[in-house]
Amino acid sequence: MEMNRRNLLKGSVAMGAAGLVASKAAVAAVPAKWDETVDIVVIGSGFAGLAAAIEAKKAGSNVIVLEKMPTAGGNSIINGGILTATGCPQQKMHHIKDSVELLEHDILKAGNYMNDPKKVHEIASHALSNYEWCVNELGVEFLPDAIGQEGGHSVPRYVTTKNGSGSGIVLKELEMVKKLGVPIRLRTYVDHIVRSQENEGPVLGVVVHEGYRFPKAGSGKQKAIRARKGVILCYGGFSADVKFRTFQDPKLNATLDTTNQPGATSELWRETSAIGCLQVQNDWIQCGPWGNPKEKGMGIGWEYNQTAAAEYGLWVNQKGKR
């Protein structure tokens, strides 16, 4: 995990939401004048964005975090607070045999072997160090004797924050960000990611609207921020954007609710495509068969359904097939 976060700073732009490769596309004009210059611009204030900001600051960079919503945390702060932690003390307490190789196998199988094996290995091999970073660096408190099993996992291997929410991690990250003096710019909408005029040149910075009022497009004051070392993209998913998700998968239309926060929209997915990124498998959107359509957001019914089926039962479709 330490290696990954530091390696993010070596390139012009790093992507936290999806694997991307360069392609030809139009780019926004380079501003005649930069209003502000920093080393690193992090877009997004969830788990990944805050972790990147913390490590970049510790590595000696001048960092800012941009968040379009009025509060930090994104989907991360409202999620279930569970973390895959192969090799953690909770597994050892319950004498659970697990390994990085088994976790890799489970991830590849769940992805119909369409995953990038190198990325899967990175995720699996750093599962324990992620947990240790949360505990040792941030002081996150997980339930000390509880270990759970999600669907698709061969053995129980997830730990849960004491408060049962992603806020148990995000709030600790926010404390560390504040301690390190990293500013989080709320209500700051990224309008453009600026590359050099040569279409395949480096990312130079971003053009934003400060004082943005979600979801009012164009609200706020425009500002150009130069990033000397790079822009780290951690803006999350787009499941609250009905139009864009329906474009990816027509079945996911407005009749389907989402557990995502309202700001999980597609503008930066579209912007990264415009600057020459090729996004992959955008139509592979996770749906929760354990959810209750009569409950808003996650609700509480999933807690029984998930445990009953994933740990003690099995999933079947409408035709009764596993």
Give, region by region, the residue ranges found by the protein language model.
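Conserved beta-strand-loop-beta-strand element in the redox core of flavoprotein oxidoreductases
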Residues: 195-224
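Glycine-rich loop(s) and the adjacent beta-strand/alpha-helix scaffold that form part
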Residues: 213-220, 226-296
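N-terminal Rossmann-fold NAD(P) dinucleotide-binding loop
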Residues: 49
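N-terminal secretory signal peptides and thylakoid transit peptides that target proteins
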Residues: 1-15
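Short beta-strand "acidic-cap" motif of Rossmann-like dinucleotide-binding folds
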Residues: 62-67
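FAD cofactor-binding and catalytic pocket of flavoenzymes
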Residues: 288-322
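Conserved N-terminal/central alpha/beta ligand/cofactor-binding core
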Residues: 11, 68-183, 187-189, 199-202, ...
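Beta1/beta-strand and adjacent pyrophosphate-binding region of the FAD-binding site
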Residues: 34-46
